[in-house]
Amino acid sequence: MAGSSSVQPQFIASTGNRSFSNAPLIENSDPEQIIVPDRKSWKNLFAYMGPGFLVSIAYIDPGNFETDLQSGAQYKYELLWIILVASCAALIIQSLAANLGVVTGKHLAEHCRNEYPRIPNFILWVLAEIAIVACDIPEVIGTAFALNMLFKIPVWIGVLLTGLSTLVLLALQQYGVRKLELFIAFLVCTIAGCFFAELGYAKPDAKEVLKGLFVPQLKGNGAAGLAISLLGAMVMPHNLFLHSALVLSRKIPRSMHGIKDACRFYMIESGFALVLAFLINVSIISVSGAVCNSPNINAQDQENCKDLDLNKASFLLENVLGSWSSKLFAIALLASGQSSTITGTYAGQYVMQGFLDLRLTPWLRNFLTRSLAIVPSLIVAIIGGSSGAGKLIIIASMILSFELPFALVPLLKFTSSKTKMGIYANSTTISSITWVIGFLIMAINIYYLASSFIKILLHGHLKLVAAIFLGIFGFLGMAVYLAGVAYLVLRRNKEATHLVALTSENPQIANESGNEGVYSLPREDIACMQLPQRRSNANDL
């Protein structure tokens, strides 16, 4: 059997005194796999390119657009340093997610299912699904705004059309993960090209932009709150599940240098993609800052700058820079909304498969997620119009801030655990840095949520009885929320599955255990992007 090319190699996994076979999810399949050559060469980087661009979409989605526009309109270039800090933190955290998948052969949602009892695991799944729906709302509204700008389609009709347009783009999944990665990379470059063109025409002061990037400052009322929004919008919970799964589409050499090279190359390719996303965010803030502080701006546009959203930004750019700039903005917004939805659909698939071992076809998964996002978006668009839809994006961002610890804490704990990562667990230094970053992000998000809630109580014009009951239930909810975060932080990891070949200094151990060949098994469900039903396997215990 060892010499047969039709036999798939298998992981040899260990849970203390017991080992079992982690068999492929598709039998006798021949998916479009991306095979990394077993050689020490920088040329291998091209085989790893792709997942970073899918992940980077979350950093340039319509929700980020709106926050960036408001930042530039109200504080010009003063908050650019927040984008720089957040991008550096995002690169570190995303690299941990990639490492988890590379080293263990399982993605974050699967680790959560193996680690936590049934009820906590179910709660984590529900929270992850809510986060994906909350992330989809800005994509729906952003795409609807873009269609309105380009074709004068009413926003509420655009909301309905978003479901159909995304289903068409999801047809790409039948061509495999590589084609999807190339298409998303094209959309990212399209977004970049649009905003770089806007930046070149707006001509912001280069010295002021550099000062905003490297001189931290928070001046004026509301600057701290907007800075928190910028930070909260940069690290998305669904992205951690997505990145840890996408890396499993590569067939990498199972050796010490093979695993280390994979982790290093994934960090480099993620760096390329996130640097491009960083430059796009800087461009949006700079264009907004330059336009709203232009000496040629009229009184009406000055008023729009005080409460700038995606829809108002189109008219603002058209009035100040010309009609072509409005079209470029709409094209970038459309590309952002569609690409974000595609990656969100696949993140939802991996979350459902990982937590529940349940798989749906992409179109059905997209239909369910998009339906939950379209309903509130459609209601708000019909009743509240464009301004109401813009406010819904802010609410969705708050929900994502609330959700982040329930994906971030498990990731930090798993990647720091030798029972899961073996010799590839985070070093003490890396663990300290990542936990500081994690606690800082969580503290910022919790502060943002608490301060927003208190603001509603004090300035929401509520009746006394309503304010009292809202306060009681609100603070009770915060207590439960903090207790849930504390449970994840303080709970000790149990002895969990990890790959023997990846936790031993001697690769020969793997071969003695029954592993065939030098390559680790790619996850065919990830490589094909189909997530089929698991078949029973006689080797599984």
UniProtKB/Swiss-Prot annotation:
GO molecular function: cadmium ion transmembrane transporter activity; manganese ion transmembrane transporter activity
Superkingdom of source: Eukaryota
Cellular component terms (Gene Ontology): plasma membrane
Family in the record: Belongs to the NRAMP (TC 2.A.55) family.
Record-linked NCBIfam families: nramp, Nramp_1, PRK00701.1
GO biological process, one term: iron ion transmembrane transport
Bilayer topology term: Multi-pass membrane protein
Annotated localization: Membrane
Organism (species): Populus trichocarpa
Pfam families according to UniProt: Nramp
Transmembrane annotation, as ranges: 45-65, 78-98, 122-142, 153-173, 182-202, 222-242, 271-291, 315-335, 371-391, 392-412, 430-450, 465-485
Protein name from the UniProt record: Metal transporter Nramp1
PANTHER family per UniProt: METAL TRANSPORTER NRAMP1, SOLUTE CARRIER PROTEIN FAMILY 11 MEMBER
Residues listed as glycosylation sites in the UniProt record: 17, 426, 511
Function: Probable divalent metal transporter.
Keyword vocabulary terms for this entry: Glycoprotein, Ion transport, Membrane, Transmembrane, Transmembrane helix, Transport
